From Swiss-Prot:
Residues 1-23, 185-377, 552-610, 724-743 are annotated as: Disordered. This is Chromatin assembly factor 1 subunit A-A. It comes from Xenopus laevis. It is found in: Nucleus. The gene is chaf1a-a. Residues 255-284, 308-377 have a biased composition (Basic and acidic residues).
Length: 896
């Protein structure tokens, strides 16, 4: 049958074309209304339904999502969870569009006319009751599912493909049995709802490959999957025919065709209902499957929740352990940082301490070096002070003088004893120069020059410079130089000439005779013999008449015997350097200083600081004496010579200061002489005879006793006692005038203190307490051996005395003291006080250094002997003015 043959040809061509490579077509336009793709929705893919496939597998394949095969030819299907229905619609509802129940379109044709596509539509693709169209060799064969459609009828249709129309396409008429068979096949397939997922071309996408084919009756939308499956065709024609199809498909409509179309419409309506029912069943099956999947998922989630709980706890525990470990790690890091910071601080502190210690060490070393330098400097200074006495003072060097540059000679130094020769030794006077000019003008040509020379004698000229003799080089006499302004220049020159050796001109110059072969010393002296043989032209000639050349003077020379060495005498030991230093130190004492044992106490001698200070003073004064020109040198006599009456005035003025003068002593008044003699006649013995009764057995200090005795003398009591002695001595010394109260003399404080220290001692004896005891020999000499102890002196001044009568029943005269100054009775005072007092007195004895044991107060240093002062005043009075010594006011002023 022609229909079957055509179908077989179509299948064969389709099988052959399947082996060809698919290339995706890229269209030059964009989609007008792109459909948004949801995650849960399946992508639009071309689906091809195959036969002999079970409905379950077809349903599974429809529910599975297809991957995009744009870059990969192999397509793999994966099972994805079915998304839930939203508003009663599933994921496939967006692709299904309900067609109207009554459709007058005789056929729905979908043709894939993509460029470079030569794939024909296979017979295995049923269109679910719709017509299947095959395009082969430029003709489009349409197979209708309605059995009543006449096969011989030709229809003219227009197929739109990307703005291109296919006209005059002749569809071959199919037989009625083929259409019925195709309709039955499609009906049976629709009852089972077979759906098969077919792999698309690797080079084409679902949206780009879909094209809308509009017929004259009703167009079909390409968005639904059913329409897509029904609109696929395989182009079996050549590429040139398939790309640009032209022509019209004509069909002759008859009554049979109309009946067929009606039947076809009915059949289509039934197929549509059947298809909707199949869709509902498929939806319910999908829903059940989805519910089962959800239950399985919940069951799995329940199982996983238990395991996840354990895992969660485990993870939580691990997380907590991890957090704890991190916290511990942070704590350890913080602790380590603190320790590092502490160590850094300690290291820094240690470095600072080390630097401080180093600075202190350096400072200490510097101080030590400074102290050592000062000590060394001090030792050197002390040594220099000691050795300075042995060193000769250095004379300042005279400044060097240089000559002026003269001609070709460079300047040279003019040393001591040198002098430059003048350019002209003759000094022309103005008269001589005028005479020379006159002779040059009035020359006489008749007189010969040689004759004039023979007539004249050669002139003599003395020394250009007169040598000066230093006074230090002459040991015999002293030269009076410029320091004495009285001397004149003539006298100085004559004096210098007289200083020389008297016979120097007679004997000539000094000569040195020395030979290297001789052992005897050289001869230095004068030799006034002159030889007639030996002269300057014959220096090696021998004068046998004057000298004996056969005698060897070396044989006659005898060495002198060494003298006695006085450096190491017997009984002397000079090995001790300390003794030498002490002797030298005591020997080199400048004038005006006392020795070590004069005027210095023991404490000052033992004190090293005072000793150093005294040595420095000595060295300083010695240095001043040396530097100020007061040098110690041997005295030299000054020889001036005889001075006559008609001598020069300079010589007379020089000796004027040595002229003799008559000294006349002035007349002294007799009264003043008597006063001086009376003062001198007052001797220590007389004073001591009146002082012993006060001194012997007295417990007071020397100062109190001196004040008491001076007051005793001022009141004239001392003179009254001496009046009888003076009257007894009138026969022997009639010139001594009796002392009256007007000429009272008070001994000085120093004199009384000296008498007390020389003639008494302050000590404690077994019979009596501590007090002053006069020496027994002094008492015998003064015939006062029976003086009581304690003393029975009646005090004139008020003195706080501690004297006490040893025996209360003794009926002697007691010391007249005020009531407040007397001691209390022994019964009213504790004995410990007396013991303490005795102890204090003993300590006073031990600590006293000057011999006045009872003195507790400092003595006045400005004390003078009264007799000397009065003598001086008397001498001044004789020169300047006359003073009446009888005046009491003058006496009071002298005493003060």
């Amino acid at each position: 049958m022609p229909g079957k043959e055509a179908a077989v040809n179509v299948m064969q061509s389709s099988t052959k074309s399947n082996t060809k490579k698919m290339v995706q077509a890229r269209l030059p336009f964009k989609r007008l209304n792109p459909v948004p793709k949801d995650e849960g929705c399946l992508e639009e893919k071309k689906v091809r339904i195959t036969k002999n496939v079970s409905p379950q597998k077809m349903l599974h394949s429809l529910n599975s999502s297809m991957e995009d095969m744009e870059n990969d030819c192999d397509m793999e299907t994966e099972t994805v969870p079915i998304p839930k229905a939203v508003n009663g619609k599933g994921p496939l509802d967006n692709y299904i569009r309900k067609a109207p129940k009554v459709s007058h379109a005789p056929s729905i044709t979908t043709i894939d006319l993509t460029e470079e596509s030569n794939i024909s539509i296979s017979n295995d693709c049923p269109l679910n009751g719709e017509s299947e169209t095959h395009l082969a060799n430029g003709t489009l064969a349409l197979e209708e599912s309605t059995p009543n459609l006449p096969l011989s009828a030709k229809e003219e249709c227009t197929v739109s493909l990307e703005n291109k129309t296919v006209e005059n396409t002749h569809f071959s008429e199919l037989k009625s049995d083929q259409l019925h068979q195709a309709a039955a096949t499609s009906t049976s397939a629709s009852n089972f709802s077979p759906e098969r997922v077919v792999k698309e071309d690797c080079n084409s996408s679902a949206d780009d490959d879909s094209a809308s084919v509009s017929s004259s009756s009703s167009p079909v939308s390409l968005s639904s999957p059913d329409a897509q499956t029904g609109s696929q065709f395989r182009n079996r024609s050549s590429p040139s025919t398939s790309t640009t199809p032209t022509g019209k498909v004509t069909a002759n409509k008859t009554s049979a065709d109309k009946n067929k179309t009606k039947d076809k419409d009915k059949q289509r309506q039934a197929e549509k209902e059947e298809r909707e029912r199949a869709k509902k069943e498929a939806r319910s099956a999908k829903k059940k499957k989805r519910q089962g999947l959800l239950k399985n998922l919940q069951r799995k989630r329940g199982k996983t929740s238990e395991s996840s709980g354990k895992e969660y706890k485990k993870e939580k525990k691990e997380r907590e352990d991890k957090e704890k470990a991190e916290k511990m790690k942070l704590k350890e890091e913080k602790k380590r940082e603190k320790l590092e910071a502490l160590e850094a601080k300690q290291e820094e502190k240690r470095k600072k301490d080390e630097e401080k210690r180093q600075k202190e060490e350096e400072k200490r070393q510097k101080e030590e070096e400074k102290r050592l330098k000062e000590e060394e400097k001090r030792v050197k200074a002390e040594k220099a002070e000691i050795t300075r006495f042995f060193q000769k003072p250095k004379t300042p060097q005279a400044p060097k003088t240089f000559s002026r540059s003269c001609g070709k000679f460079a300047p040279f130094e003019i040393k001591k004893g040198m002098a430059l020769a003048p350019l002209c030794r003759i000094d022309f006077e103005p008269e001589a120069s005028e005479e020379l000019d006159r002779f040059l003008q009035e020359q006489n040509s008749k007189i010969y020059f040689f004759d004039e020379i023979k007539k004249r004698k050669p002139r003599k000229m003395g020394q250009t410079t007169v040598p000066t003799v230093n006074s230090f080089e002459v040991d015999d006499v002293q030269v009076l130089g410029e320091s004495d302004p009285v001397l004149g220049s003539n006298m100085l020159e004559g004096h210098i000439k007289d200083i020389g050796v008297p016979e120097r001109k007679k004997f000539g110059r000094m000569k040195l005779l020395q030979f290297c072969e001789n052992h005897r010393p050289a001869y230095w002296g004068t030799c006034n013999r002159r030889s007639r043989v030996i002269n300057s032209r014959k220096p090696w000639a021998q004068d046998t008449g004057m000298l004996d050349y056969e005698v060897d003077s070396d044989e006659e020379w005898e060495e002198e015997e060494p003298g006695e060495s006085l450096s190491h005498s017997e009984g002397e030991n000079d090995d001790d350097p300390k003794e030498d230093d002490e002797d030298d130190d005591g020997f080199f004492v400048p004038h005006g200083y006392l020795s070590d044992d004069e005027g210095v106490s023991d404490e000052e001698c033992t004190d090293p600081e005072n000793q150093k200070f005294r040595q420095k003073l000595k060295a300083k004064e010695w240095y001043e004496l040396q530097t100020n020109g007061k040098k110690i040198r041997a005295m030299q006599p000054v020889v001036i010579g005889c001075v006559w009456w008609d001598s020069k005035a300079s010589e007379i003025s020089l000796l004027q200061k040595f002229s003799a003068c008559i000294l006349e002593s002035p007349a002294v008044d007799e009264e003043l002489a008597q006063e001086i003699s009376s003062a001198q006649s007052l001797k220590d013995r007389q004073i001591l005879s009146k002082l012993v009764p006060l001194l012997h057995g007295n417990v007071n200090g020397s100062k109190i006793m001196i004040q008491e005795f001076q007051e005793y003398c001022r009141r004239g009591l001392f003179l009254e006692d001496n009046a009888s002695d003076a009257a007894g001595n009138e026969s022997t010394s009639p010139n001594v005038t009796p002392q009256t109260p007007s000429n009272i003399i008070v001994p000085s404080k120093a004199r009384l203190k000296r008498l007390i220290s020389e003639n008494s001692v302050y000590e404690k004896r077994p019979d009596h307490r501590m007090c002053w005891y006069v020496h027994s020999d002094v008492l015998k000499g003064l015939q006062q051996d029976n003086l009581p102890v304690p003393c029975q002196w009646t005090y004139i001044t008020q003195v706080n005395s501690v004297a006490k009568e040893d025996n209360g029943a003794n009926g002697g005269s007691l010391q007249s003291l005020p009531l407040s100054g007397k001691r209390k009775s022994a019964g009213s005072m504790p004995i410990t006080k007396f013991m303490k007092r005795a102890k204090d007195l003993e300590t006073a004895i031990n600590t006293d250094m000057d011999g006045f044991q009872a003195d507790n107060e400092e003595d006045d240093d400005d004390c003078m002997i009264l007799e000397d002062q009065q003598a001086k005043d008397a001498e001044d009075s004789t020169i300047e003015c006359k003073i009446n010594l009888n005046d009491s006011a003058v006496l009071a002023s002298c005493q003060n």
